[in-house]
From Swiss-Prot:
Gene Ontology CC: one annotated term: ribonuclease P complex
GO molecular function annotations of the record: 3'-tRNA processing endoribonuclease activity; ribonuclease P activity; tRNA binding
Source organism superkingdom: Bacteria
Designated name of the protein: Ribonuclease P protein component
PANTHER family: RIBONUCLEASE P PROTEIN COMPONENT
PROSITE patterns from the UniProt entry: RIBONUCLEASE_P
GO biological process, one term: tRNA 5'-leader removal
Keyword field: Endonuclease, Hydrolase, Nuclease, RNA-binding, tRNA processing
Pfam families from the UniProt entry: Ribonuclease_P
EC number: 3.1.26.5
Catalysed transformations (reactions): Endonucleolytic cleavage of RNA, removing 5'-extranucleotides from tRNA precursor
Family per similarity comment: Belongs to the RnpA family.
EC primary class: hydrolase
Length: 110
């Protein structure tokens, strides 16, 4: 089992990851930036107001965080930063499908 990723917390960290690779999925967009230091992967979550009100956005964020925690963290590459931009489909997707999609995007496969 891999180590748990750290969190991206500062706006500057989120903006830096935007310069990296974008991996589009049905339930979310994953932005990836290789820091080049081989350290613990870091992850940040964001859900835009387009998805819904605060309750809906928080539910989407919680589902994504749990999917990363229980399953997809093992597929994160050390030294990478990830920003997961949630979409409203992430709320209705079966949890197993959400986990599998996250793992695929972290590995960089379609």
């Amino acid at each position: 089992m891999g180590q748990n990723p750290k969190r991206l917390l500062k706006r500057a960290e989120f903006l830096a990851v935007r310069r990296g690779e974008k991996r589009r999925g049905r339930f979310f967009l994953v932005e990836v930036l290789d820091r080049g230091d081989g350290g613990v992967p870091r992850v940040g979550y964001t859900v835009t107001k387009k998805v819904g009100n605060a309750v809906v956005r928080n539910r989407v964020r919680r589902r994504l965080k749990e999917a990363v925690r229980v399953h997809a963290a093992d597929d994160m590459v050390p030294g990478n930063d990830y920003v997961i931009v949630g979409r409203d489909d992430a709320l209705r997707a079966p949890f197993g499908q959400l986990k599998a999609e996250l793992s695929r995007r972290f590995r960089g496969t379609r």
